[in-house]
Amino acid sequence: MFTLPERRRAARARASVSCALLSIAALAPALASADDVESGWNHDFYEARTLVSDGSVPADFPDGNLKNGWGVAFNPQGFVWVADNGTGKATLYDGTGKPNPLVVAIPPAPGETAGTPTGIVFSGGADFITNGTTPTGAPLSGPARFIFATEGGQISGWAPNVNTATAFVMVDNSHGGGAEHAIYKGLALGGGGTTHLLYAADFHHSRVDVFDGAFKPVTLPAGAFTDRHLPRGYAPFGIQAINGDLFVTFAKQDKAAEDEIAGRGFGFVDVFDPNGKLVQRFAERGVLNAPWGVAIAPSSYGRFGGAILIGNFGDGTLNAYGPITGHFLGSLRDGHGRRIRVDGLWGMQFGNGLLQQPTNSLFVAAGPNGEEGGTYSVINAVSR
């Protein structure tokens, strides 16, 4: 049987160095090394602002439910949703960071006191029917609008016509909390022909599990989502659907294959088609450091407009790559040329254009202070 504190203890110990980082900032000039500072950023740069926090760091709005903010997903017609790994909740915000009254509970797996959501996706179709109970206890079913993966090995759906207060487990690979449970660190929604498919990154077993629109397992060709040129000990960590393909980030496993090992150069990013066929080794080593979040920047996002942005959980930096070649273009930096660092960086998505959530603003969630805290922030391109 496992518990969240046991699984994350090593990660928190590794992240204890985060006291040297601000929750969202570049290093102070007196502490910055030559490698951290780059000239030519005084007119075209990026600016970060912490919109929400659990109170552990200054922010525009407080929210005690926001601890270890992980996945980020936008309702195309509404608020952003953030998966709160540390509280087993999902919380909603507008573009200023103002919390929405709706707070959704994510069910715990056996051995957990609360759910441990990681990846989250929005689903707007009629599939992914979720079975649950109404607030009065009556059974009811309906299509999930948001779907969550958890470190406990479960996938849950939230169907608003069933129960707005909680999601319901639709895939259970927790194995009763045993040692062989899946540990889903990321989730993506993609397609195979005319169908929708869920892709869950199982870090523990070094694989990507795939489910159809009925939450049933899908068998892909042998060797799907594998890269024989990866070093041993690397496993799927984050996953993001972009332009019909799946970007999969790989992080180095600890001895228990439960958590990532941070370190400069500890990371790879591959691109696969919906059937799991390797298309491209997109990025490797270099500045990668336990990479998790992936987003494609709009053309209006400053000097890195149109680039693929990859966020490092390991050191909190955000790095840009050419969308076709994967050539490293540089790191997001502030007006002093210092790398922007988001302590405990996880999910990153551009806004939906509604509720003060611009399509050229990058919204990010994080678990600062060794994943004990939580933040939701925005990073904008600035020209002057």
Label each PLM-derived region with a short phrase.
Residues 1-13:
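N-terminal secretory signal peptides that target proteins for export/translocation
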Residues 8, 28, 36-37:
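Intrinsically disordered, low-complexity, hydrophilic segments
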Residues 12-19, 279:
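Intrinsically disordered, low-complexity segments enriched in polar/charged small residues
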Residues 33-384:
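Sequence/structural signature of beta-propeller domains
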